[in-house]
Amino acid sequence: MANEFKVCDECQAVNLKTLIPKLKEIDPDATIEIGCHSYCGPGRKKTFTFVNSRPVAALTEEELMEKVLTKLKNK
């Protein structure tokens, strides 16, 4: 089963221009869904993505990428 990433294009802490290329680097075959995912509270202060329908958030994109990799290894 292919991995799926969901990212928000409305949340203040999410920078799609830098986040999407990093997610594609981790898994080029994953699907990436862009849109509101009703995660607005945490999305104001932390960058986040949903990895296979599970939320993953961090204060920096670098920390987020580490958490995404961990989530994918433990799936």
Swiss-Prot record:
Highest taxon in the source lineage:
Bacteria
Q: Which InterPro entries does the annotation name?
A: DUF1450, UPF0741
Q: Show the Pfam families listed in the entry.
A: DUF1450 (PF07293)
Concerning its family, UniProt says: Belongs to the UPF0741 family.
Which HAMAP family does this chain map to? Answer: UPF0741
Name listed for the protein in its UniProt record: UPF0741 protein Bsph_0950
Which species expresses this protein natively?
Lysinibacillus sphaericus (strain C3-41)
